[in-house]
C-alpha cells in the first residue's frame, strides 16, 4: 500500500513538472511573438471529422489584448479587439456587436495568445509533443475544450486547432507569418460605419 502511494505521488510530481515545463516553454514562445501578422486558412469539421466549411483571411495580433481578425472568404466579417472591447462586425447584415474583452475571450484559450496575464494559466493544463502544445481547459463548462498550437523551426506559429466542447473543431493554417508588420496606428480601432446597427453588450 505504501509503495503504491509512493508511486502515485512520484507520478503526480513528475506529471506536474512536465506540465510546468510545457507551460513555461509555451509562454516563452508566445512572448517572442508579441506582434505578428499572417494569412489564415480555416477548415471546420463536425465531431465525426466531416468537413463543414472553409474560410480564409488575414490576422494581426499585438499583445496584450489587441487583434484584428478579417475573414475575407467565403463571406466577409471582421473582429477587432482594441485592448478593452471586442467588436464583431458582419457587413452582410450591417450589424456590429460590442463586447467587453474579458467577456469575449476570458473563457477561451485564445486569451493566452492575445493576452499576457500569467494568472490565467492556472485555468489550463498544457502538454507538449515536440513543437506542438495542447492547452486544455480545467473548466468543464467552457465552450472551447482544447486549443492546440504548432510552431515551425523559426518559432513562428504555423497552425492552431480549436476543439469545441460539443466535438466540432476548426484547424487554422497560417502563412506569410510576419513578426514585424508595419502598423498605421488604426488597425485595432473600430469605427462604426454609417448605417450599421450597434448591438452593445458591454
Swiss-Prot record:
One of its GO terms (cellular component) is outer membrane-bounded periplasmic space. It is found in: Periplasm. Keywords: Chaperone, Periplasm, Protein transport, Signal, Transport. The keyword Cytoplasm does not apply. InterPro entries: LolA/LolB/LppX, OM_lipoprot_carrier_LolA-like, OM_lipoprot_carrier_LolA_Pbac. GO terms for biological process: lipoprotein localization to outer membrane; lipoprotein transport. It comes from the Bacteria. Residues 1-20 form the signal peptide. Participates in the translocation of lipoproteins from the inner membrane to the outer membrane. Only forms a complex with a lipoprotein if the residue after the N-terminal Cys is not an aspartate (The Asp acts as a targeting signal to indicate that the lipoprotein should stay in the inner membrane). Monomer. Belongs to the LolA family. This is Outer-membrane lipoprotein carrier protein. It comes from Aeromonas hydrophila subsp. hydrophila (strain ATCC 7966 / DSM 30187 / BCRC 13018 / CCUG 14551 / JCM 1027 / KCTC 2358 / NCIMB 9240 / NCTC 8049).
